């Protein structure tokens, strides 16, 4: 029997409930394939501030570094709005990214047939939408040099610097190519090469990687065109790879297109242990009420099985079970429509388990 070590970080708000739901699903799925899991519970975010005075402890960092994967619920909430900015709950995510060397964010956007009505786009536009945004996570303008406001009156100014190195672009392109190879073998590299010098380097390296991976059909879009194409023809995309800034914007656009943010998972990957989490927040207003949608966390666990645990059959089983639950009409409050079966967090997890 193989053995895996997984760090669980519930975090704050609804994090405890959705992590418990995902763990329950995983326990059943792992048992079916004879995998033993050592679950390691750790705190981060506001829960860690309350317990230890900091959002991320060395103990949690070391546990994550030594694990096969990290599954996170959500961090933050108004309770910690007035703490010192240097120890805000969100610093835990940034700290984990840095300590684990996580330079790539994978954001799948899939619209299930049973949820097409939730998209703000017409049904005929969202049929067959199933793509992944590969976002560079540690470079670009978010991490560049900057100068806050200087001067006075009409002469006030501020600036931010966008820089990308060959090394940074090559490694994110490699992940995009490998991701596409496991899917439909199509990559769109997104930049603003008609204006930005950093984007011209980005495109040059993307073209080199395309030549080195002839089995992958590669195209090149400007970011403004990509934003439009995501609205008028989102089904054309398979893998989108782009910079930190552009990926931040486009992945949120993709989330809105889906119409069901509670179902969207994500993965942050790099040189160390990968981190998996749903894209939604900690929703403290519904915590402890068995109202949270656990499917984004359950699907994040499926991504964990596929990318970190080498258990693609478990990932497929979980994803298929989630899709069947939706077909059968089970809905938490955030995606409920009259005539369907309204359930809570634990009931939704149980429905997934019954269909594994």
Describe the residue ranges of each PLM region.
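Glycine-rich phosphate/pyrophosphate-binding loop and the adjoining helix
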Residues: 138-139, 143-183, 187, 193-195, ...
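Glycine-rich phosphate/diphosphate-binding loop of Rossmann-like nucleotide-binding domains
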Residues: 7-24, 28-30, 153-224, 236
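Buried hydrophobic positions in well-ordered alpha/beta secondary-structure cores of metabolic enzymes
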Residues: 12-15, 68, 134, 176, ...
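N-terminal beta-loop-helix "entrance" segment that forms/cooperates
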Residues: 34-58, 228-230
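Extreme N-terminal starter segment of soluble prokaryotic enzymes
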Residues: 2-6
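Buried hydrophobic packing segments
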Residues: 22, 26, 206, 297-308, ...
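N-terminal glycine-rich phosphate/adenylate-binding segment common to multiple enzyme folds
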Residues: 50-159, 245-247
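Glycine-rich phosphate/nucleotide-binding loop
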Residues: 46-49, 230-330
